[in-house]
C-alpha cells in the first residue's frame, strides 16, 4: 500500500518510500494504461517477440541514469540476452565437473542460482555488495556473519570478487575490540551488535586464496582476522579451557 505506481513514457514505475524503485520498460509499440496501482500493456499487432526490461534501482538518481540505457538494450535485445547467457554459462563452467553424477550437477546449478539471485549491491549502510540469506521475511534481507562466510566460500570458485566483497561488508562494522557483529542492514540502526556467530571467515578467505592466489586480499584481511580471533579468546572463552563459545554479549 506504500508503493506508488506511475507510467512515465514507456515505463511502469513502482516507487517505495525508501527511495527504491522497480521499473518495467516496454518498447514504443506497446500501449500502456493505468488504473490505480494496476497497469495494462497492449500490443496491437505483435509480429515479433515483445521484449521487456525489468530493473531495480536504489535511488531516484540511479533510476534516472539507468532508464536512459534501456532503449539501447531493447533495440538490440539479442546482444543483452547473449551477454546474460554467457555470464551464467561462465559461472557454471567453473563449478560443474565431469566426474559428478547428473543429480549432483543439478544441486550445484541450484546452489549457484540461489547465491546469485540473492546477490545485492552496496547501498545505504551496506558499504560493499554481498548476498542475503533469504527473501522469506524482511529481517533476512541483510548480511549475516556466518551466512556471509559460507556464501563467500561457495562463490570463491566462480565469482571471487563477490566473495571478497561479502567478507569486506561484514568487516566494515568490525568493533574496536575485534568483534564482527551478527548482522547488518541498509539502515544501520537495525544492525545487531548484541550477538556473534561462529568464526568461519578464515575458511572463506582461504577458499578465495585457493582459487585466486590473491595474496593482496589475504594481506588486507589478516590484521582484521587476527583482531577477530583475539576477540574470541578474550571474550568468548568464558571458562578459559581453550574452547570458545558463541552467543550474546
Name each model feature, range by range.
Residues 1-141, 215-233:
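Acidic/polar, glycine-enriched structural segments that form the non-catalytic walls/loops
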Residues 141-249:
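Aromatic-rich carbohydrate-recognition surfaces in CAZymes
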